[in-house]
């Protein structure tokens, strides 16, 4: 392949080399510069690892490792963030559903970046957690395992999505989740000031997970990014009231755009009674092992 000249036509060069639409390449260049954009595009083309979360209700990491190895699966904790002690990286299997350990509910698949959203000790054992856009359910399940004597209210916009969460939780034998079909832009009066922790993992452009779902890059335009950022604000402006005073709001996305991430967090702090806890985490696809992901943790102040 003959590539366009990189120095005079960088967006076209990156577009051809990494099979990314030119408009999207131009957007990334404007936001992240030449080097970081190319590193990101390279990361999208690398093989993605499969990470799993141990179902601590049924087993521990040692027990899960032994069960998987007995089925011929290769298991390691290499490259897993030190804050997470219940995850493994697996390879060398044909089909997850064919594994007895999977069918027995000893684990569920969740990317390492996504697991980090619940970290930090904010979900106490007796917490009441609301997860507003919960499908396929990884964060709800993670929260239910942490709040093992507490409760999780897991919601999404359609019956199909909610049944997916339920199916996953039932396979794992998790019984402290209730399910609700609910559109997050509509206020649920019954939930006002009820949540110790509110999980807002909102619909986004998904640009952090292009490595897993390459089709995403053909569907995202700058207009779409702006539309999604507005939808996220619409949801946040509705659901923030569910958080109790001194409760925690976790805002996360699987994207890397400032419009959907840092700018929305700043908007939330400027318009509602919340303060940031620590610095938000923007995980880039090229940072290491997990997907591109954003996490901000905020505390309700009044």
Feature roles, as predicted:
Residues 1-302:
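S-adenosylmethionine
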């Amino acid at each position: 392949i003959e590539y366009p000249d990189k120095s005079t036509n960088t967006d076209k060069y990156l577009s051809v080399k990494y099979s990314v639409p030119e408009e999207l390449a131009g957007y990334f260049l404007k936001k992240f510069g030449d080097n970081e954009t190319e590193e990101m595009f390279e990361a999208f083309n690398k093989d993605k690892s499969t990470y799993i979360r141990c179902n601590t209700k049924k087993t521990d990491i040692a027990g899960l490792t032994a069960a998987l190895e007995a089925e011929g699966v290769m298991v390691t904790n290499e490259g897993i963030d030190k804050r997470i002690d219940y995850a493994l990286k697996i390879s060398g299997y044909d089909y997850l559903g064919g594994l007895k350990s999977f069918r027995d509910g000893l684990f569920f698949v969740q990317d390492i970046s996504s697991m980090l959203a619940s970290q930090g000790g904010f979900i106490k054992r007796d917490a009441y957690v609301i997860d507003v856009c919960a499908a396929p359910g990884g964060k709800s399940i993670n929260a239910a395992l942490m709040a093992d004597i507490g409760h999780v209210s897991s919601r999404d916009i359609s019956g199909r999505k909610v049944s997916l969460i339920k199916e996953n939780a039932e396979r794992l034998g998790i019984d402290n989740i209730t399910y609700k079909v609910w559109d997050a832009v509509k206020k649920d009066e019954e939930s006002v000031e009820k949540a110790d922790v509110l999980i807002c993992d909102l619909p986004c452009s998904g640009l952090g997970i292009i490595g897993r779902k390459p089709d995403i890059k053909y569907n995202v335009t700058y207009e779409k990014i702006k539309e999604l950022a507005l939808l996220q604000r619409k949801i946040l402006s509705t659901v923030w009231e569910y958080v109790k005073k001194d409760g925690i709001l976790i805002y996360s996305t699987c994207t890397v755009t400032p419009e959907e991430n840092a700018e929305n967090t700043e908007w939330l702090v400027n318009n509602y009674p919340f303060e940031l806890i620590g610095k938000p985490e923007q995980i880039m696809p090229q940072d290491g092992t997990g997907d591109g992901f954003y996490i901000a943790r905020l505390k309700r102040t009044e």
